[in-house]
């Protein structure tokens, strides 16, 4: 998904501050916001079968060997997801029902400033491009911009009861500024709940500068094996895609090819008529 827009100076909404991260799930005795099902995480808590909220929705904080922070969410129902505060609150490794779904790069660590996008790109379920640039380097802006390589501040997380399920919210701010120019803040909230494979990313871009500025954003979603396998086909209601470079003979930008040494990337732009796309022929239906 991608989009380009603008924001006027001094405008933008801010999210509601979260309660204390260690606060229990709030629910009056015997009440739910929607009918409960027998297998939901909330029902397990209500019946006393699980004594603590982190028994159905846990969040573990850790640091990797390079010092970067990771919030690992494990949710009743099968979703396991890493949130990366030091990479713009993007999404790292992800599993559903024990099956890895995110593509991850073979790089062991980010080598740091001075290297290009491809050397620093670690993959993960989501890498956000922008808000200063998307695509090839342009002017002083490097390939795909700075969001994915910028640390989030004021990061916090909390749990909320949602009917018979429990949702984990992670929130933080990612700043993009120059000394005498642009001052943008991307306020991001990630929501993932028990009982569903969905994860929601809510972004609000605020312009704290003194002039209107364009804000290109591209959400670089990376799905990989074993969920995605050679032969998988993208189904999208769209005109024929525009490709950056002509693909090799017999290769379609809509079909994942077999692995081949030295194969070049095929970059295609799809302009769907509806905001829905499907993958068929994957390793798991």
Where are these regions (language model features)?
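Short, acidic/polar linear motifs in exposed loop/turn regions
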Residues: 208-210
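Residues within well-ordered beta-strands of beta-sheet-rich folds
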Residues: 202-204
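Surface-exposed acidic/polar loop and edge beta-strand patches at domain peripheries
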Residues: 15-200, 212-214, 223-229, 236-260, ...
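Compositionally biased, low-complexity flexible segments
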Residues: 7-14
């Amino acid at each position: 998904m991608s989009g380009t827009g603008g924001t006027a100076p001094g405008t933008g909404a801010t999210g509601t501050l979260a309660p204390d991260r260690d606060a229990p799930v709030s629910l009056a005795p015997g009440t739910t916001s929607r009918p409960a099902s027998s297998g939901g995480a909330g029902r397990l808590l209500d019946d006393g079968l699980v004594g603590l909220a982190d028994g159905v929705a846990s969040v573990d904080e850790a640091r990797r060997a390079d010092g970067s922070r990771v919030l690992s969410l494990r949710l009743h129902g099968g979703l396991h997801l890493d949130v990366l505060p030091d990479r713009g609150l993007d999404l790292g490794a992800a599993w559903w029902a024990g099956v890895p779904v995110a593509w991850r790069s073979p790089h062991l660590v980010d080598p740091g400033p001075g290297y290009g996008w491809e050397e620093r790109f670690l993959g993960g379920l989501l890498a956000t491009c922008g808000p200063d640039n998307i695509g090839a380097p342009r002017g002083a802006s490097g390939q795909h911009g700075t969001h994915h390589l910028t640390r989030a501040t004021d990061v916090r997380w909390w749990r909320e009861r949602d009917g018979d399920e429990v949702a984990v919210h992670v929130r933080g701010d990612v700043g993009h500024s120059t000394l005498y120019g642009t001052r943008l803040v991307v306020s991001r909230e990630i929501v993932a709940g028990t009982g569903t494979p969905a994860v929601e990313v809510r972004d609000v871009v605020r312009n704290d500068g003194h002039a209107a500025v364009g804000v290109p954003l591209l959400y670089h979603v990376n799905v990989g094996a074993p969920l995605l396998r050679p032969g998988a086909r993208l189904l999208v209601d769209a005109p024929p895609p525009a490709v950056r470079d002509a693909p090799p003979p017999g290769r379609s930008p809509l079909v994942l090819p077999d692995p081949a040494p030295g194969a070049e990337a095929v970059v295609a732009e799809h302009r769907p008529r509806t905001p829905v796309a499907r993958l068929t022929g994957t390793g798991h239906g």
